[in-house]
UniProtKB/Swiss-Prot annotation:
Lineage summary: Eukaryota, Metazoa, Ecdysozoa, Arthropoda, Hexapoda
Compositionally biased tracts (Polar residues): 128-145, 384-401
Motif (NPF 1): 3-5
Major location (coarse): cytoplasm
Protein name per the record: Protein stoned-B
Region (Interaction with Syt) residue spans: 847-1108
Domain called MHD: residue spans: 906-1219
GO biological process: chemical synaptic transmission; clathrin-dependent endocytosis; regulation of endocytosis; regulation of synaptic vesicle endocytosis; synaptic vesicle cycle; synaptic vesicle endocytosis; synaptic vesicle transport
Source species of the chain: Drosophila melanogaster
GO cellular component, one term: endocytic vesicle
Length: 1262
């Protein structure tokens, strides 16, 4: 008859009254069916609403109370507002609700407690019965649906229908946790109400009708006497915002998955006895609190949700089987008088317990059936239910507080036990076992909940809970199934750390006498004796609890919530210790810490009762507590070995359950922790302290190679071409210098020298190398620069390399240069708005645009203007490179000063970082040498006389940068490099750099200067961005040059693919073969160009030709770019604008094949070109990983920070060996020209023999 959903009229009056689902406003004489009995359309779900608020609704409610037994309140869960939400209210119910003023929980509780078990409820009117049927069906359906909705991250633990319907604090807390809504009001209210009840009399006449209800704040049994800690009576919190419970579908729709059998129906008459027995199960058979009459009206129900009043000591009400007051459980063994003193506590506990367990999502039929069907279980559960019923008044009061909890939705109830049961509370076995094995669970739970609960619950549960355990599993009470007192928290969340969850109400724990320790009144008394709020409800052995508490006190300080699924602070905090982020029961008053805090003793989770609680709650992945904490608190009150906090392991350690199992061996199921699933809830493990942790590489965005070579044992090798020692270079000067008529210009052979006169480098042009006086001298200035090396037609045979020495100056002019976007973007945006204004006819908008345009002005670019000083040319490429480097070295050393303050319309700063690397490889690809340096160029257009501070990623500056937000240059990576052999331009304050490693300088105006340069050591094992393999193959009269280029493509994971640009590969060709590549044109000789062939593909006319005859092999074929003979290089040059090509991925290969068919008269040099030369650039400082991190402009006269642009470039030069192979057939020329090895050695070794006359030979060549 524990099933409040049972609608039989056979239920005892008391039991019937216990059915909280009875919503009828009119008491029904035939109150056999607790659901039918609704005298005043009282909400059958309001537990003891009548009892609680008999005064308020003496008439209707009294009748209803009589009609509804505490057992009648469904699982001790007075569902008023929430029940209404869950179930379609009957018109009568609504009327009653409207008619009857909502009674305060306290009132309801007080009424509930004082009233003896209410007489059987009258048979509820047909409307009530229909309503009950609908509600039960809806609840069942809703629970299943909600369970299905539970996020995968939460182990889907079926929520008992009881929990769904129970407004008990447990659901409240759970809801808050699930919803992440602070249940302070609700939890507090529940807790307070429970607190009051518990404190007022733990053994108060009112037992927790709902054994499953976990008092949100279950006072410690020890604190049976009202504890001052309870003082924190928080007004009942309004129900936390909970998703509107799915409206119960019409009875037809909601196929009653489990038709709620009337509680009385299951075992109507025995309801009270069974309740007693159940209470006896907990060891408190001696005295049973009178069950508060079920709330008769919605007001009652609502009042149930209101903050519970500290119930006056009430006569033991008929224990609600479903509710099975924890109080009764605890105090039943105690004499009723005990209950009276503890009435407040017991009431409070009862209410707490009731609400908590009531809110359990126990499926009414299953849990009820289980409880009712099994006499023992029914007895224990009944006692609990009756207690819950009595507390149902209390619970009702608490329920009033409980409004936070939305009974309707499983989601609302974030119960750990609910979670424990992956599905409907049908798995009560585990939970029931927890009740029986609370000890075991408490261990596991104890991590989360105080051991006290475990002790009392264990005793009580072992007696009755084994029996009730089976029914309870259905309940899946989050903490409701667990002794409310145990956690001392109505909605203590097994996962919630009591401290974190909510302010623990120390007094409450006292009241939290172990509800389940009915058999252990003394224990309860002991707990009360321990005024500490952490008094263990179950702590028959205070010493154990103390050790336990001490063990977890330290843990709790850190964050019990991490693993404290049950020790959630009584309050429901969004981030509660609850597995869902809040204490499962949301018992604010009960601060029983899972670690055994004063309030933890009040662990209201009924850890022992619910294997879910017994189980260690896995840390939520998203829980800050779980993630941040290095350990999980595992409370094992019964375990002697648990002398300290158990380290948080990946999954909650099964051993904890094992301990509880040992304690509650009778419930093997309890040992199974549904949350133990490591895959589901891996608890954060301790960070590796043995150095095995993954070490961060120097660069998170680059391949797993160091940014630089750590080996500095060898001195840096000098960068090539820096120091030139020689007479000068033979070059040609383009004359006249200024272009007039092309036909009049010519090349004049000269000699160029670079000398220093008065500390100023001077370029001298001489007619002859022996001349003493140059015919022209050109002192270099900082604004001079050399151009890139080019080539132009020299004569009919080929081209000449050219280079200009030029003077560069800049002008501000309207326009937008590539890369300049800021002002242009602003104007573009304005234009867009202008178009909108114009279309809309918004004259004001058009005027505004004109005003803005006038303010902004046209985009301005600083366009470089170059004036050519002279152009020189040479047929030798290396000479041109050397001359260019020498000029740049001279310019770098020229002092540059900012002579005057200028004014710019737009201030701009440009920084260019250039990597230069030279690599030598043998034909096998082995790197013989790589030398790299970095150069930073700076160009500024700034108003006034500002000072610049440039920040680069120098490892010495890591962590010491202090710059304004406008000065920061966005960077894609955090990389810090080592600078070696740093050289500065004269403008840099070198003393400041030596002191602080900061680069400060006053930039010259509009001068593109090389600000600094430094060396880096590229790592030896770094993969080159472009790899060439070239081979000469000589076979007979055929020579084949084959080259393969591999482009890894990805040099940076974060920056993405960085291509190689302007790739040129030179394969020197012997002069004797040059004619093969020459083609006569009108006025000059041209070169044979390559055919672009994709491997294995033939297109164009070649398709037709291929069908008739084999394709003629082209002299040069390439798969990418173009290759041709370039006479000025005396080489076949393969050029590709970009590798890999657009759209290609990493590790692409590109091929060149040059087939030369030689005649027998063609010479074959004894040695073909040993090296190929590769040059290319990359748009990033791929070699050094240099980054410009900030550009700070100080003492600027500008109104706004200057626009800043940073460009990165890497220049690569490779010298790669070419392998030479010979085919089987011997080349005729080579064979003919092979040196004849006469036999001097052979003849010398021959033994001298007497000459034989050739007389016997017919043919004598002599």
């Amino acid at each position: 008859m524990a099933n409040p959903f049972l609608m039989d009229e056979d239920l005892d009056g008391c039991d019937a009254a216990a059915n909280p689902f009875l919503m009828q406003s009119e008491p029904e004489p035939s109150s056999d069916n607790p659901f039918m009995a609704a005298t005043v359309a009282s909400n059958p779900f309001a537990f003891g609403a009548d009892d609680l608020e008999l005064g308020a609704e003496p008439e209707a409610e009294a009748t209803h109370d009589n009609d509804l037994d505490p057992a009648m309140s469904f699982f001790g869960t007075t569902i008023e507002a929430e029940d209404d939400t869950l179930s379609l209210k009957s018109g009568a119910e609504e009327e009653d609700e409207g008619k009857k003023p909502p009674q305060s929980q306290p009132q309801l509780q007080s009424h509930a407690h004082p009233h003896p078990p209410p007489p059987r409820p009258l048979v509820p009117p047909q409307s009530t019965q229909d309503l009950i049927s609908t509600v039960s069906s809806q609840l069942d359906e809703t629970s299943s649906e909600l369970l299905g909705r539970i996020p995968a991250t939460r182990s889907p633990s079926p929520v008992s229908m009881r929990d769904l319907h129970s407004p008990s604090p447990t659901p409240d807390s759970g809801l808050a946790d699930l919803l992440d809504v602070s249940v302070d009001s609700g939890s507090s209210a529940h807790t307070q109400g429970i607190e009051a009840d518990l404190i007022s009399g733990v053994a108060g006449g009112v037992r927790l009708d709902n054994p499953f209800a976990v008092p949100t704040a279950v006072p410690n049994i020890q604190a049976a006497v009202p504890l001052p800690a309870t003082p924190i009576k928080q007004p009942p919190r309004p129900p936390p915002p909970r998703p509107a419970p799915p409206r119960p579908a019409p009875p037809g729709q909601a196929a009653p998955q489990r038709p709620p059998p009337p509680l009385a129906a299951v075992n109507p008459p025995p309801a009270a006895p069974e309740a007693d027995d159940l209470l006896d199960m907990f060891g408190t058979t001696a005295c049973k609190p009178a069950k508060p009459p079920p709330p008769k009206s919605k007001e009652d129900i609502l009042s149930l949700f209101e903050q519970p009043h500290v119930p006056l000591s009430q006569p033991a009400s008929k224990p609600d089987l479903l509710h099975d007051d924890l109080d009764e459980t605890i105090g039943e063994g105690e004499p009723p008088e005990q209950e009276e003193p503890d009435t407040e506590q017991s009431n409070e506990i009862s209410s707490r317990d009731e609400p908590v367990f009531t809110s359990l999502l126990i499926r009414p039929d299953e849990s009820t059936h289980d409880i009712t069907s099994q006499p023992q279980a029914a007895t224990g559960l009944e006692r609990q239910v009756n207690n819950m019923a009595a507390p149902s008044g209390t619970a009702s009061t608490q329920r009033a507080t409980t409004p936070d909890i939305e009974i309707t939705t499983v989601e609302d109830l974030p119960r750990s036990d609910d979670e424990d049961e992956p599905e409907a509370m049908q798995e009560p076995e585990t939970e029931t076992k927890p009740q029986i094995e609370p000890d075991t669970e408490p261990e596991i739970v104890s991590e989360h909940s105080p051991p006290t609960e475990r002790l009392v619950t264990q005793a009580a549960l072992v007696d009755g809970e084994l029996i009730a355990a089976e029914p309870e599993p259905e309940e899946m009470d989050t903490g409701l199934d667990f002794p409310l007192a145990s956690s001392g928290q109505l909605s203590a969340n097994p996962f919630a750390s009591p401290d974190e969850e909510e302010p623990n109400f120390a007094p409450m724990p006292a009241a939290v006498a172990n509800i389940f320790a009915v058999n252990d009144p003394d224990s309860q008394m002991e707990t009360p004796k321990a005024p500490s709020h952490t008094a263990n409800i179950f702590a028959s052995d205070p010493d154990e609890f103390d050790a336990f508490s001490a063990k977890f006190d330290s843990v709790k300080k850190d964050n019990i919530s991490i693993m404290d699924g049950f020790g959630g602070s009584g309050a429901i905090t969004p981030t509660g210790g609850d597995a869902w982020g809040g204490s499962a029961f949301g018992s604010t008053t009960i601060s029983a810490n899972a670690c055994g805090d004063t309030n933890s003793a009040d662990d209201g989770f009924g850890n022992d009762d619910d294997d879910f609680y017994a189980m260690q709650a896995p840390a939520r992945a998203d829980s800050v507590e779980s993630v941040d904490k290095d350990f999980s608190v595992v409370i094992r009150p019964m375990a002697e070995e648990t002398s300290g906090v158990a380290p948080q392991l990946a999954p909650p350690p099964p051993p904890a359950r094992g301990v509880n199992q040992a304690q509650t061996t009778s419930l093997p199921g309890l040992t199974v922790n549904p949350f133990e699933d490591v895959s589901g809830f891996p608890a954060p493990g301790l960070p590796p302290t043995d150095g095995t942790a993954i070490k961060r590489t120097d660069s998170q965005d680059t391949p797993q190679t160091p940014l630089y070579d750590e080996d500095v044992s060898q001195p840096l090798e000098e960068f090539p071409r820096l120091h030139y020692i020689g007479p000068g270079w033979e070059m040609q000067l383009r004359q006249p210098n200024k272009k007039k008529i092309t036909g009049q210009r010519f090349w004049k052979k000269i000699v160029v020298r670079l000398v220093v006169q008065n500390d100023v480098p001077v370029v001298q042009l001489l007619n002859q190398a022996g001349d003493k006086q140059p015919f022209q001298e050109l002192p270099l200035q900082p604004s001079y620069s050399v151009s890139e090396i080019g080539a132009q037609q020299y004569d009919q045979f080929g081209k000449i390399f050219t280079m200009k020495l030029q003077y560069i100056f800049y002008k501000e002019r309207p326009g937008v240069r590539p890369g300049q976007v800021t002002k242009a973007e602003r104007i573009t945006n304005k234009l867009t708005k202008f178009a909108q204004y114009a279309i809309a006819g918004d004259y004001e908008g058009v005027k505004e645009f004109g005003s803005d345009l006038k303010k902004l002005g046209l985009p301005v670019e600083h366009a470089p203007q170059s004036s050519q000083l002279f152009k020189i040319g040479s047929m030798n490429y290396e000479d041109m490179k050397q001359f260019s480097v020498c000029i740049e070295e001279a310019l770098f050393k020229i002092p540059a000063l900012r002579e005057r303050a200028l004014t710019y319309k737009m201030e701009e700063v440009q920084v260019t970082a250039v990597d230069e690397i030279t690599v030598e490889q043998d034909f096998e690809g082995k790197i013989l040498k790589q030398i790299a340096r970095v150069r930073l160029f700076f160009l500024a257009f700034l108003t006034g006389m500002p000072t610049i501070e440039l920040g680069v990623n120098d490892m010495w500056r890591q962590g010491k940068e202090v710059v304004g937000r406008h000065d920061i240059i966005p960077v894609a990576t955090e990389e810090w490099i080592r600078l070696e052999a740093v050289e500065f331009h004269s403008v840099v304050n070198q003393k400041e750099y030596e002191r602080t490693r900061t680069i400060k300088f006053q930039p010259p105006d509009a001068n593109y200067i090389e600000l600094l340069r430094f060396r880096v050591r590229p790592p030896k094992n770094r993969e080159l961005p472009l790899q060439l393999k070239a081979t000469w193959c000589v076979s007979g009269n055929k020579v084949e040059l084959r080259a393969d280029i591999l482009v890894p493509g990805f040099t940076s994971r974060k920056l993405g693919q960085i291509p190689c640009e302007d790739v040129s590969v030179r394969f020197p060709i012997p002069e004797c073969w040059i004619y093969l590549f020459r083609v006569e044109k009108h006025f000059r000789y041209g070169s044979v160009k390559s055919a672009h062939r994709r491997t294995g593909k033939i297109k164009g006319i070649e398709r037709i030709l291929g069908a008739v005859d084999t394709l003629q092999e082209s002299l040069i074929e390439v798969t990418s770019g173009q290759a041709k003979y370039e006479h000025h290089h005396r080489a076949i040059v393969w050029r590709c604008p970009r590798l890999p090509k657009e759209g290609q991925g990493a590790y692409t290969t590109h091929q060149l094949v040059c087939r030369m068919a030689l005649t027998s008269y063609d010479q074959i040099p004894s040695e073909l070109a040993p090296y190929a030369f590769v040059e290319f650039t990359m748009p990033a400082t791929q070699v050094s990983h240099t980054t410009v991190r900030s550009v700070s402009v100080q003492d600027s006269d500008g109104d706004e920070p200057p626009e800043k642009y940073v460009r990165y470039l890497a220049r690569h030069e490779y010298k790669v060996g070419i392998e030479t192979t010979h085919g089987e057939s011997t080349n005729a020329y080579l064979a003919a020209t092979r040196p004849i090895r006469e036999e001097p050695p052979t003849t010398a070794t021959k033994p001298t023999a007497s000459p034989v006359a050739p007389s016997d030979s017919d043919t004598d060549s002599n």
